[in-house]
């Protein structure tokens, strides 16, 4: 595996770890702290998603992650968060 491939893989792995960290953070927040309708929940979610999107954009600009892969990562996280939100509000 070339150095560039290793860098690309490491960048994508790190972005996935960050996405998983956000999902975990929101799960903990919903389970223990606040309701999805709480402004604090929305603020944390918006801030975390904005930060991850900036990470993805940066990795794409450096050529470490394909633009479409970055979009798919964000879509996957948004879908998982949406499912989590639905499950929490339908309980």
Swiss-Prot record:
Coiled coil: none annotated. InterPro entries: UPF0358 (IPR009983), UPF0358_sf (IPR036270). It comes from the Bacteria. It holds the Pfam family DUF1507. Belongs to the UPF0358 family. This is UPF0358 protein SERP0701. It comes from Staphylococcus epidermidis (strain ATCC 35984 / DSM 28319 / BCRC 17069 / CCUG 31568 / BM 3577 / RP62A).
């Amino acid at each position: 595996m070339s150095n560039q491939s290793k860098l690309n893989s490491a960048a994508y792995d790190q972005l996935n770890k960050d996405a998983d960290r956000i999902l975990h953070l929101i799960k903990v927040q919903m389970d223990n702290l606040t309701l999805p309708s709480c402004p604090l929940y929305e603020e944390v979610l918006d801030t975390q998603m904005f930060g991850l999107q900036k990470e993805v954009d940066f990795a794409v600009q450096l050529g470490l992650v394909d633009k479409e892969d970055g979009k798919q990562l964000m879509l996957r996280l948004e879908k998982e968060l949406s499912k989590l939100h639905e499950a929490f509000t339908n309980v």
